[in-house]
């Protein structure tokens, strides 16, 4: 354990970097770091911390980067031993920009888990939670005053995104929801409030059913990754991708897609990379196709990388 006196001998120093990883730490005592006001980088990776409290990080007002990767106890599956992050545990970290909490078994977020992180730009929560199956409009409410740019939520067994789950994150640029178990129809309201979004990564999820409004609220989107998500309803009209005039990269690979319309990619004049491999598009380019070949690539004047591998194509329309 650390206590308020552990680092008192360093009070005359200007220490900026402290690595406490692999120390079997179980307890971060109140005011442990109060002697280190110049600290900018702190690593507590690979420890057995059982609890963070509102004064665990007191005094670290200049900290820029904090890694809590595998920092918490993982010893038992019983509910009682889940590590606990008290509300306001991060409240003193006014200048923190980077926070990594990957690979832990924390129950979920509370309404003030991240309160006070008013400079936070990068938050990685990959394989962090045990009970985050549903994202709601309260999950990230404590980030409402954080200028967050990147949020990594991979490998959390997330199965549903409710309306407005990210509505607090108006500056977010990159949202990574890959490698989860999301299984739902995308109404579009899931992305409400993401006014600055640049990339949404949804690849490797269970089942996504599209609607014409699936991406209507994120016209700023430039990269959309939908690889291996058992994608359904791609052939609806108007196309789900129609609002995405700024899109440059679209990945629809490994979805066994067989039916699409000519207007699937209509209006995507900025599209540069299209990954469409491992689908079932063979029939669409055959002369014998009812209604003739489906020219779904028309108008894509900026396209310079096109992957149609493993689609069974044996005819290319003239």
Briefly describe each language-model feature range.
Residues 1-318:
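Extracellular leucine-rich repeat
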């Amino acid at each position: 354990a650390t206590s308020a006196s552990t680092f008192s001998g360093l009070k005359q120093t200007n220490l900026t970097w402290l690595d406490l990883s692999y120390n079997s730490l179980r307890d971060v005592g109140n005011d442990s770091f109060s002697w280190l006001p110049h600290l900018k980088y702190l690593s507590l990776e690979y420890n057995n911390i059982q609890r963070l409290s509102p004064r665990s990080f007191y005094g670290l007002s200049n900290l820029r980067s904090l890694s809590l990767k595998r920092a918490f106890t993982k010893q038992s599956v019983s509910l009682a031993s889940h590590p606990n992050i008290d509300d306001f545990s991060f409240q003193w970290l006014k200048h923190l920009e980077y926070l990594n909490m990957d690979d832990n078994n924390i129950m979920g977020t509370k309404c003030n888990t991240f309160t006070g992180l008013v400079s936070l730009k990068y938050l990685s929560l990959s394989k962090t939670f045990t009970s985050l199956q549903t994202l709601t409009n309260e999950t990230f409410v404590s980030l409402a005053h954080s200028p967050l740019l990147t949020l990594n939520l991979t490998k959390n067994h997330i199965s549903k995104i409710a309306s407005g789950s990210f509505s607090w994150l108006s500056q977010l640029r990159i949202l990574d929801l890959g490698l989860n178990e999301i299984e739902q129809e995308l109404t579009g309201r899931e992305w409400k409030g993401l006014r600055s979004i640049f990339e949404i990564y949804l690849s490797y999820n269970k089942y996504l059913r599209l609607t014409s409004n699936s991406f209507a609220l994120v016209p700023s989107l430039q990269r959309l990754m939908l690889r291996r998500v058992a994608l359904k309803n791609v052939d609806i009209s108007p196309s789900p991708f129609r609002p995405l005039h700024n899109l440059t990269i679209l990945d629809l690979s490994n979805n066994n897609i067989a039916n699409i319309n000519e207007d699937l990619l209509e209006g995507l004049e900025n599209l540069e990379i299209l990954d469409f491999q491992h689908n079932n598009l063979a029939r669409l380019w055959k002369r014998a196709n009812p209604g003739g070949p489906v020219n779904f690539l028309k108008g894509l004047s900026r396209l310079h990388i096109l992957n149609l591998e493993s689609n069974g194509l044996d005819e290319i329309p003239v």
